């Protein structure tokens, strides 16, 4: 019996030694480099970042749905789907579809509130590849497409000081971008292009004039740059400068101090 214990102990020692040697060999084969910030000069051949003359992104956002979560991450996303995020439409007055401003011309509720919810809901649908949620998302997205006007404007007409406010549209543009990443639906590009062409017709002193839309003007610029990068049309750069000049006229300290 004593000899058996000796052999077992020896076998465990040899196994442990081999494991340590393997780990040491694996760690010595690789190197770790610490940098202040990522290299922005290398070209990513898989995903597009910002096009010049925009400053390259430190990290390129992956298209929504390109990563399929597993394990505890997926479990938490499923809890969101089965909880308030996935069922908010059943209890929220803002998501009531009858007379909703995103589904009905002249609707009386659901301006910025709808895209606030839809941005997270739709991304969750794409990531989980949930057919029911994707169908619900598509219902709202089709409502957005149906709201397009001949001059390029889309969505609810919420007038302040005699002009159309752009706050709710800024948020819905994010929803459309996520939808495009998932579906490659060309209607998104057409809608956004025509919408920003309409913005170019708005006099500078009337663009982003209201406090809230001016506060969110940077959100508008992000959507412009998202559209500019794959196509490189000078028009997008011009509208970006136009929006930036109007948005940056209000000190961020005044907004958030």
Describe the residue ranges of each PLM region:
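Bacterial N-terminal signal peptides that target proteins for export
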Residues: 1-11
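Bacterial N-terminal signal peptides
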Residues: 9-20
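Glycan-recognition and catalytic cores of secretory/periplasmic carbohydrate-active enzymes
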Residues: 27-257
């Amino acid at each position: 019996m004593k000899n058996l214990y000796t052999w077992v102990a020896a076998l465990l020692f040899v196994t442990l030694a081999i494991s340590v040697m393997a780990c040491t060999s694996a760690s010595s084969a690789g190197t770790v480099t610490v940098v202040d910030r990522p290299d922005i000069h290398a070209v990513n051949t898989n995903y597009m970042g910002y096009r010049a003359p925009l400053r390259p992104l430190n990290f390129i956002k992956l298209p929504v749905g390109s990563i399929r979560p597993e394990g505890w991450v997926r479990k938490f996303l499923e809890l969101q789907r089965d909880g308030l995020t996935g069922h908010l439409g059943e209890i929220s007055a803002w998501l009531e579809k009858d007379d909703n401003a995103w589904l009905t011309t002249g609707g009386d509720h659901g301006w910025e509130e709808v895209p606030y919810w839809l941005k997270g809901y739709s991304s969750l649908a794409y990531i989980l590849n949930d057919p029911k949620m994707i169908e619900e998302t598509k219902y709202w997205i089709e409502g957005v497409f149906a709201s397009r006007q001949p001059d390029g404007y889309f969505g609810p007409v919420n007038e302040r000081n005699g002009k159309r406010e752009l706050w709710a549209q800024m948020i819905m543009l994010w929803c459309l971008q996520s939808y495009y990443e998932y579906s490659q639906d060309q209607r998104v590009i057409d809608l956004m292009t025509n919408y920003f062409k309409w913005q170019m017709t708005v006099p500078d002193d009337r663009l982003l004039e209201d406090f809230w839309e001016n506060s969110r003007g940077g959100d508008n610029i992000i959507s412009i740059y998202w559209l500019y990068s794959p196509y490189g049309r000078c028009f997008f750069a011009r509208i970006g400068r136009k929006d930036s000049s109007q948005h940056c006229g209000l000190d961020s300290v005044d907004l958030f101090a």
